[in-house]
Amino acid sequence: SQKKYVFKYAGRNSRLDDIQAAVLDVKLKYLVEDNQHRKEVAHLYYEGIKNPIVTLPDLLPDEQNAYHLFPILVGEGKRDALHDYLEQKGVGTVIHYPIAPHKQECYAKEAWNVPQLSLPITERLADEELSLPIGPTITRDEINDVIRLINIFR
């Protein structure tokens, strides 16, 4: 696709060359440690983020989440504004699916015929989802900055 997150063709992405495999082999040695760090970051987000326009992911009992991502929902139509605000403050966030999958051009073809579907939950997620930084190298100071900036955002 020439434009990020805009898909003309249905398909999949499943590449893994030799170099990527070698890097992955090294990274796997740190998987348990990295997952534990991400769980600690997620816990700090759950404890610290108090902005009423932000909905945190459900925390289910006995769940085992690796927290590869930490997607929040930003209500009141302010997702893009919060994304831009955090970006200006040096905090990288990601909007993973700005267009609901069933509204992508690749599904507009007659064979698929899905753009007319009404999927309100999917559309809400596309409008409100924002993923916070949660990688294995994020520091406590950076986490505190993310929390502080989200809490003062209006």
Regions found by a protein language model. Name each.
Residues 1-154:
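PLP-dependent aminotransferase class I/II
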